[in-house]
Amino acid sequence: MQPIRLGLVGYGKIAQDQHVPAINANPAFTLVSVATQGKPCPGVENFQSLGELLENGPPVDAIAFCTPPQGRFALVQQALAAGKHVLVEKPPCATLGKAALWIKREQASAPCSPCIAYAPAIAAARDWLATRTLQSVQIDWKEDVRKWHPGQAWIWQPGLGVFDPGINALSIVTHLLPLPLFVESAELRVPSNCQSPIAASIKMSDPRLLDVRAEFDFDHGHDELWSIQIRCAEGTLRLDNGGALLSIDGVRQTVAEEGEYAAVYRHFQQLIGDKTSDVDVQPLRLVADSFFVGSRVSVEAFYD
């Protein structure tokens, strides 16, 4: 069977550190071209735009998008119109209205698959939680924007800020919990010179009134804190390192060694083979609702 010929749109830090290594490690894919206006990707043909890649590049079967959500919708639509399978980084696009069109496409078996929660410990955590009585959830997602997005002004555009990494936590939690979540209240702390929050406190619940709290911080310091703690009547489950580590009642559990992006591309391969889609907008809805109901608190200006 011939490998899936893949084009990549965007070649920033995440693409370089995560996507390209995962693609190269999966024999089901071969990276043949990249569209980037920055540094070129070595070993493949590089183009200035998706249109140029599709028109003048080698044939591709699928496109993976590693671009900011603003402006991504038109690019994804262009790839879908060209009949390409599509993999989209979370958040899939900038608004729920645009994402709704992809859900309709999913019903028509269009191949559109935003990344969801594929960190190594997630499957084991979900299995353990399936037979437990949930009591509360605490999310702490804190990192240094200067480390992960140095000089990237797009991160402060409306709808992003600390929610750019925070949606990763929401993707994991909504994947783990059996019922949909709803935002009850939020406090968004916005630097006086930015459009989006540098920190946020969010209170959520589900139809059974499960207490879910989240603390997001984009100015946390060099050492990241990416943890989710779920208290149950039968014990406490904790995920650390963004879902790479799993502990139950303080005891570290053995989990799969497969990395998140390796699992993402394995899932993408399966979707292409099955001619199906995986479109999940609940994390984006929670972000949108946080902006909708959240109080805005102005804090000191942020300088990179």
UniProtKB/Swiss-Prot annotation:
GO terms for cellular component: cytoplasm. Pathway: Carbohydrate metabolism; galactose metabolism. It holds the Pfam family GFO_IDH_MocA. This is Galactose 1-dehydrogenase. Optimum pH is between 9.1 and 9.5. It catalyses: D-galactose + NAD(+) = D-galactono-1,4-lactone + NADH + H(+). The lineage of its organism: Bacteria, Pseudomonadati, Pseudomonadota, Gammaproteobacteria, Pseudomonadales. Keywords: Carbohydrate metabolism, Cytoplasm, Galactose metabolism, NAD, Oxidoreductase. Catalyzes the dehydrogenation of D-galactose by either NAD(+) or NADP(+). Oxidizes following sugars in decreasing order: D-fucose > D-galactose > L-arabinose > 2-deoxy-D-galactose >> 4-deoxy-D-galactose > 2-deoxy-2-amino-D-galactose. One of its GO terms (molecular function) is nucleotide binding. InterPro entries: Gfo/Idh/MocA-like_OxRdtase_N (IPR000683), Gfo/Idh/MocA_oxidoreduct (IPR051317), NAD(P)-bd_dom_sf (IPR036291). Gene3D superfamilies: Dihydrodipicolinate Reductase, domain 2, NAD(P)-binding Rossmann-like Domain.
